[in-house]
Amino acid sequence: MYTAGSVIIEDGVWIGDKVTILSNVRIGKNAIIGANAVVTKDIPANCVAGGVPAKIIKTITQ
């Protein structure tokens, strides 16, 4: 039997075009995921991430 894990997307997240988000991943508040990224692990709040696999590019300071 196949079961999928949950994906949690918190408030204020921007997700670019054609992004793939794998199961059991949390994307933190106000994070930005660049177009065509593949998110394989959690992305912390207030970060910009992109690439294959997605990596943190920058931390957003407010």
Question: Which role does the model predict for each range below?
Answer:
Residues 1-50, 54-57:
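Structural signal for interior beta-strand "rungs" in well-ordered beta-sheet cores
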